A protein has these predicted regions:
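Membrane translocator/pore-forming domains, dominated by Gram-negative outer-membrane beta-barrels
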Residues: 1-187
């Protein structure tokens, strides 16, 4: 949900829920046997944000400066590996993201963008146990700062069809990269 104002300021919010599937096969060694697990975890979340789109250069080109608060909850999960019972605690994630995105219109069908953001995770801790006993596994924590760089494109194939490509790199508390390809049909 997004509301754009004439001065370029916008507010946005979203709700989401789903199921996260995690499968690990033939990795955990139990005696002479390779075993694994398969778990499904319910999650839900929300975000609120505010930003300002500032026109620049050619018509349609802009800089989007924004701030977002993102909340996500992952349910706890119990599973068994080779007779051993494991419990993963629920996780609460609260993040603040401040960033910018530069949008450039290439032609009437193609828009490119790139940007950067700083994100701070306020928590994201997880505790685990085996057969009812707390275990010290240096419980993972995502608390801390991450810098995110992104690049992407939006191609409008027709009035109804469009394709989005996106790539992101993460440095700091979270490290790695992600990408997505999305086809959109508008009614």
């Amino acid at each position: 949900l997004r509301k754009d104002n004439a001065d370029g300021v916008y507010t946005e919010a979203s709700l989401r829920a789903g199921n996260l599937q995690n499968e690990l096969r033939n990795v955990v060694i139990a005696g002479d046997e390779l075993v694994g697990y398969d778990i499904d975890t319910f999650y839900y979340g929300a975000h609120v944000g505010i930003g300002k789109v500032i026109p620049r250069g050619n018509e349609g080109d802009s800089i989007d400066v924004y701030g977002k608060f993102i909340y996500t909850h992952y349910d706890d999960e119990d599973f068994t590996v080779d007779g051993g019972k494991f419990h993963l605690d629920s996780i609460e994630s609260e993040r603040l993201r401040l960033g910018f995105r530069i949008n450039e219109v290439q032609n009437n069908k193609l828009n490119m963008y790139y940007g950067a953001a700083w994100e701070y995770e306020f928590g994201g801790d997880s505790n685990n146990s085996v057969v009812g006993y707390d275990i010290d596994v240096n419980a993972p924590s995502l608390e801390g700062s991450t810098v995110i760089g992104e690049i992407g494109a939006h191609y409008k194939a027709s009035d109804k069809w469009s394709i989005d490509l996106n790539g992101r790199a993460y440095v700091g508390q979270r490290e790695g990269f992600s990408g997505s390809v999305q086809a959109n049909y508008s009614f």
